[in-house]
């Protein structure tokens, strides 16, 4: 699933293609379950709207429209959002497309049909914002803010990093990478982290996310940016999906376990196991 760096990359790549453009209509919808509100209401509301800005909240792509509406798009497992020629929307896995005033289309290619497209008013956008934790790259996401989010949390730190209510945008890839960089075992209870470990984790989270954005995200399967280009962050993984390989730091063998129903990769030598608090 695309995480914060991938969605940020898509937003940045779509901005020069979409900002200032007008949506002239709903060109294609063959999977109505992905859409909110109903197709007829959506089509009536979206036509003639000008795209004023493109941004991101957590793993949601946000297209700010005139009239205080926002088009919120979640790529889920296999979604790709591209600006392309109209004939491209006839491809088998394109389930949603919008006509633009320059003759091109914004298309949503989604092989697994898990993606979502929501047209939100101000109240709906506020509700989406409220269910997510702070943005880990924001200026106010300090080590103290991270410590506050983890206070009294006995769940494994890996599970806590995946909780979008606590911290927005981090998924399985970058949780693994951040914990390795910070030398923290993924099963360590959040409440057990020392101030020094929290500082290290804070730095690691921001570092791995920024590095991934610089490298245009991780293209493991379906992910592409708004121009259809692959990212290269997968070439820089230290532990993710590297079970059985040597740790880049100490040469011990990287291991795999399951935490919060997700594959979890770590170095048993570098990442020390902590005990559950009593």
Curated annotation (Swiss-Prot):
> Which SMART domains does the annotation name?
Fapy_DNA_glyco, H2TH
Obligatory cofactor(s): Zn(2+)
Zinc finger intervals, FPG-type: 238-272
What is catalysed by this protein?
A: Hydrolysis of DNA containing ring-opened 7-methylguanine residues, releasing 2,6-diamino-4-hydroxy-5-(N-methyl)formamidopyrimidine; 2'-deoxyribonucleotide-(2'-deoxyribose 5'-phosphate)-2'-deoxyribonucleotide-DNA = a 3'-end 2'-deoxyribonucleotide-(2,3-dehydro-2,3-deoxyribose 5'-phosphate)-DNA + a 5'-end 5'-phospho-2'-deoxyribonucleoside-DNA + H(+)
Which Pfam family, any one, appears in the UniProt record? Fapy_DNA_glyco
Q: Which GO terms describe its molecular function?
A: 8-oxo-7,8-dihydroguanine DNA N-glycosylase activity; class I DNA-(apurinic or apyrimidinic site) endonuclease activity; damaged DNA binding; DNA-(apurinic or apyrimidinic site) endonuclease activity; zinc ion binding
Which keywords does UniProt give here? Answer: DNA damage, DNA repair, DNA-binding, Glycosidase, Hydrolase, Lyase, Metal-binding, Multifunctional enzyme, Zinc, Zinc-finger
- Reported EC number(s) for this entry are 3.2.2.23, 4.2.99.18
Question: Which superkingdom does the taxonomy of this entry point to?
Answer: Bacteria
Q: Which CDD domains match?
A: EcFpg-like_N
An annotated GO BP? base-excision repair
- Do you know which InterPro entries this protein is assigned to? DNA_glyclase/AP_lyase_DNA-bd (IPR015886), Formamido-pyr_DNA_Glyclase (IPR020629), FPG_cat (IPR012319), MutM-like_N-ter (IPR035937), Ribosomal_uS13-like_H2TH (IPR010979), Znf_DNA_glyclase/AP_lyase (IPR000214), Znf_FPG/IleRS (IPR010663)
Q: How is the cofactor bound?
A: Binds 1 zinc ion per subunit.
Q: Does the keyword ATP-binding apply?
A: no
Q: Which residues form the active site?
A: 2 (schiff-base intermediate with dna), 3 (proton donor), 59 (proton donor), 262 (proton donor)
Positions binding DNA in this chain are 93, 112, 153
Q: Which PANTHER family match?
A: FORMAMIDOPYRIMIDINE-DNA GLYCOSYLASE
Say what the protein does.
Involved in base excision repair of DNA damaged by oxidation or by mutagenic agents. Acts as a DNA glycosylase that recognizes and removes damaged bases. Has a preference for oxidized purines, such as 7,8-dihydro-8-oxoguanine (8-oxoG). Has AP (apurinic/apyrimidinic) lyase activity and introduces nicks in the DNA strand. Cleaves the DNA backbone by beta-delta elimination to generate a single-strand break at the site of the removed base with both 3'- and 5'-phosphates.
Q: Which HAMAP family match?
A: Fapy_DNA_glycosyl
Query: Could you say which protein family the record assigns here?
Result: Belongs to the FPG family.
State how it assembles.
Answer: Monomer.
The protein here is known as Formamidopyrimidine-DNA glycosylase
The species this protein was found in: Chloroflexus aurantiacus (strain ATCC 29366 / DSM 635 / J-10-fl)
The gene designation is: mutM
